[in-house]
Amino acid sequence: MNSEDAALDLLRRLNPKDISKNLDTILSVAPDLADVLLSSVDQPLKVNTCSESGNQYLLCDFNRDGDSYRSPWSNKYDPPLEDGLVSTDRVRKLEVSLNEAIRVYLDLYYEGGVSSVYLWDQDDSYAGAVLIKKASTSNSSGWDSIHVFECLPTTETNVYDYRLTSTIILFLSSGSEEQSALPSKALNLSGHLTRQTSQRLPAADDDTEIANVGKLVEEMETRMRNFLQDVYFGKTKDIINQTRSIQPVSDAQPNDSALRSVLNDLSI
């Protein structure tokens, strides 16, 4: 196993909540891996406030140019940057509309949080990223969704191939940050899940394209949320139920003895 694969394998096994800290630690030891790790490892999203509109937005590689980040609300960089990368007028118009649509989706499904949509031009069409962050008031729990998509033209008129890669970074804690440091005081669950999908959909105008992207994100989030609930949390619940009993051990021992006796009789 080479150093790149070893670093990625290590990060997959560590707590997703601490992935930024762990990534910095690895890069301090192996700085030559910076390009590979920073481009392939999704980190929890950070929040900034647009100085012009007052709206919050999320920071990521998709709105970064150097050390500056572009606000999807004002289309300006912070710190200010001359000749920063911006999209064409049509793609920028789509970006504004998608930000408004995802904000409505955020209020309906998450009852608050921060969302950002960033679009950029490609040769024949465009691509983008839909970002969603929902954290508890104490920041002891959080949900980060990162949806990266591209819209590719086909041989059919007004029909496009949409390819979506979605990542969810989830961490939950049953106690405060002080309690989380003590294993006996809190239960901590963390997960990192990535899925891909593609669909061929008609899009005769901008409104249809916005609806298509919204549909893809909504369906993918629902599918991933159900998977986490049924498989990840379901398996965790089974493990806890097997290792924890609400009745005293002394009360359970007679039942265990009786069960073993029955099993022994059945095996004869």
From Swiss-Prot:
GO terms for cellular component: actin body; actin cortical patch; cell division site; cytosol; F-actin capping protein complex; mating projection tip; medial cortex; nucleus. Its main location: cytoplasm. The gene is acp2. Disulfide bonds: none annotated. The keyword tRNA processing does not apply. This is F-actin-capping protein subunit beta. Component of the F-actin capping complex, composed of a heterodimer of an alpha and a beta subunit. Keywords: Actin capping, Actin-binding, Cytoplasm, Cytoskeleton, Nucleus. It is found in: Cytoplasm, Cytoskeleton, Actin patch; Cytoplasm, Cytoskeleton; Nucleus. InterPro entries: CapZ_alpha/beta, CapZ_alpha/beta_2, CAPZB, CAPZB_N, F-actin_capping_bsu_CS. One of its GO terms (molecular function) is actin filament binding. The keyword Nucleus applies. GO terms for biological process: actin cortical patch organization; barbed-end actin filament capping; cell morphogenesis; mating projection actin fusion focus assembly; mitotic actomyosin contractile ring assembly; mitotic actomyosin contractile ring contraction. Belongs to the F-actin-capping protein beta subunit family. Signal peptide: none annotated. Pfam families: F_actin_cap_B. F-actin-capping proteins bind in a Ca(2+)-independent manner to the fast growing ends of actin filaments (barbed end) thereby blocking the exchange of subunits at these ends. Unlike other capping proteins (such as gelsolin and severin), these proteins do not sever actin filaments. Competes with formin cdc12 for attachment to the actin filaments barbed ends. Slowly replaces cdc12 on the barbed ends in preparation for filament disassembly during contractile ring constriction.
